[in-house]
Amino acid sequence: VDLISGPTALYLAHPRINLVPVTTAAEMYQAVTTRFQDVDIAVMTAAVADYTPVEPEDQKIKRKVTGFTLQLKATLDIAAEIGRTKRNDQIVVGFALETDHAEENAQKKLLTKNLDLIVLNNLTEPGAGFRTDTNRVTIFGKGNKRADFQLKSKELVAEDIVEEVYHLIRGISHA
């Protein structure tokens, strides 16, 4: 297993997990796209960022009396890129962090990015999202398939996702 991750305090003791550290969206894109041809399943747990500075600074930007305008550009969409290049024998799982029109946006991403499953993380749900140890997700699959899950620990949510991937492989996916 290759775990491509930005800066983290995770301690990985398992000998079969290879941590690939990255610090920028461009490094993440490079790490994912160069390894993707050799994987059976890719789980894209989060977008790096939707936007990145046009001119990144390597030092602190000092406060200016006249104000400051930060110019941003869209980052490369890594999930869309691997969805575009995936083979029929590969599975790609994406995630959608949404606040409005959540189900519609998640299903649109599933199709436009050519994903096999997408995990909807709706930030408007109580107990879901960031700053909590719980989550409530809906997993969508192609052909209008869906699986709704109750609020539970994020560890159990991860197990649900793995189970849905297993069902997809076996041809009995609920999502």
Each predicted region: which residue ranges?
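A cross-family phosphate/adenosyl-ligand binding-site feature
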Residues: 1-97, 101-175
